Amino acid sequence: MNDWLKYEKNGSVVTLTMNRPDIRNPLGEPEDVINFEEASKLVNDDRDVRCVILTGAGKAFSAGGNVLHILNIA
């Protein structure tokens, strides 16, 4: 994991927090997929996990796609 996608386990519950609150947690960077894949592997490999909560830091869950990134690759 990295600073953008935080992985926290409390008992059988894992909380994944998207942590770009200054820009409302957009998705779309290439490393976003890698981070979610890594988190999924950790969850799948841990037989104790019964629940995964996906949340966003700050005032918004997620603004959606990262428009700045999309404009840069178009």
Residues covered by each model-derived region:
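Short, flexible, mixed-charge acidic loops at enzyme active sites
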Residues: 64-74
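Conserved CoA-thioester-binding segment of acyl-CoA-metabolizing enzymes
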Residues: 1-57, 71-73
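Short, active-site-adjacent cap segments at secondary-structure transitions
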Residues: 59-63
